């Protein structure tokens, strides 16, 4: 994309042009240097849209819940963006891309924008590409952006650092509730959502989790909420959305967005450092090092010195 065309695309994106958004997202996805594109956008636009992260284990019903949230928010005339990060094969890189199928009923709605992409094997649920695309979509005139991450469960921390509100979705009978608590999840989520409340074991799972949360000491006096619902429970899902809205509004006043921006800056620094290492073929040259004869620290110090 040429410079003038890029500037025009950014201007059109800022003006609310969906085609320009789609075009810019594709350009970011395929670019060798996506971070520079995101920076060009952020030089001319601010992140104004709250990002809601939805993570959880496989089979928890994340996509179905988001689909229900979209229906409720659309009845309120809200504009919604969705990034559905699907699991990808670590060998082939192929993505299941099943999440978008569950949301197909909204595909003809011009106030709903859904983007599916592969995780590229990122265990934390948020690949580098999805991180950048989330930031791009947050400058568009959506009222909410939902980012559904890979449901692997080893690390939900990626999305919680980017999102203004993070939901851990659990399903009854999957045996994952205690494991979730052991994983330090209290430190990184705002809402634990027991899905599929129409199942008989859901009540037991809910009370079990509630007992764990009540006994646990959440960091920094963080108020973690636990709720129970299912995709067809419009009343409860509306209550959940109201809760999210209230927390996001409060956290904005308390400066949580600043924390998110600081993380954004750190990510940019990491990406730029990595690019320098790649461009200067420093990583490639490591293959020539004799690690048996040199201290690793010596090699690292020399690389840092060469970069100065």
Report residues per predicted region.
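Conserved nucleotide-binding/hydrolysis micro-motifs of P-loop NTPases
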Residues: 87-90, 119-120, 151-153, 173-176, ...
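Walker A/P-loop
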Residues: 63
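Nucleotide-state-sensitive switch-loop elements of NTP-binding domains
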Residues: 5-52, 57-60, 71-155, 165-168
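Conserved ATPase-coupling elements of RecA-like P-loop NTPase cores
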Residues: 126, 153-159, 177-179, 201-205
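Canonical P-loop GTPase G-domain recognition
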Residues: 191, 197-250
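Inter-motif core of Ras-like GTPase G domains
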Residues: 139, 155-173, 183-193
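Long, well-ordered amphipathic alpha-helical subdomains in the mid-to-C-terminal portions
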Residues: 228, 239-308
């Amino acid at each position: 994309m040429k410079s003038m065309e890029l500037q025009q695309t950014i201007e059109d994106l800022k003006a609310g042009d969906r085609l320009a958004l789609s075009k810019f997202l594709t350009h970011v996805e395929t670019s060798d240097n996506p971070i520079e594109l995101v920076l060009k956008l952020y030089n001319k636009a601010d992140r104004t849209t709250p990002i809601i992260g939805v993570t959880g284990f496989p089979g928890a019903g994340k996509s179905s819940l988001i689909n229900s949230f979209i229906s409720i928010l659309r009845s309120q005339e809200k504009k919604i963006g969705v990034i559905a990060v699907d699991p990808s094969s670590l060998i082939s890189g192929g993505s299941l891309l099943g999440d978008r199928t569950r949301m197909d009923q909204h595909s003809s709605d011009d106030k709903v924008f859904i983007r599916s992409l592969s995780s590229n094997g990122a265990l934390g649920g948020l690949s580098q590409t999805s991180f950048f695309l989330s930031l791009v979509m947050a400058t568009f005139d959506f009222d909410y952006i939902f980012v559904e991450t890979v449901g692997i469960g080893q690390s939900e921390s990626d999305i919680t650092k980017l999102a203004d509100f993070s939901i851990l979705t659990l399903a009854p009978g999957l045996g994952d509730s205690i494991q979730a608590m052991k994983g330090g999840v209290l430190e990184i989520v705002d809402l634990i959502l027991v899905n599929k409340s129409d199942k008989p074991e859901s009540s037991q799972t809910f009370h079990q989790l509630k007992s764990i949360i009540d006994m646990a000491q959440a960091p920094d006096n963080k108020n973690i909420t636990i709720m129970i619902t299912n995709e067809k429970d419009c009343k409860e899902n509306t209550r959940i959305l109201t809760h999210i809205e209230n927390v996001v509004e409060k956290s904005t006043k308390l400066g949580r967005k600043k924390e998110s921006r600081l993380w954004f800056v750190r990510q940019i620094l990491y990406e730029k450092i990595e690019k320098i290492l790649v461009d200067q073929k420093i990583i490639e040259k490591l293959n020539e090092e004799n690690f048996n004869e040199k201290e690793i620290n010596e090699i690292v110090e020399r690389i840092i010195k060469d970069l100065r």
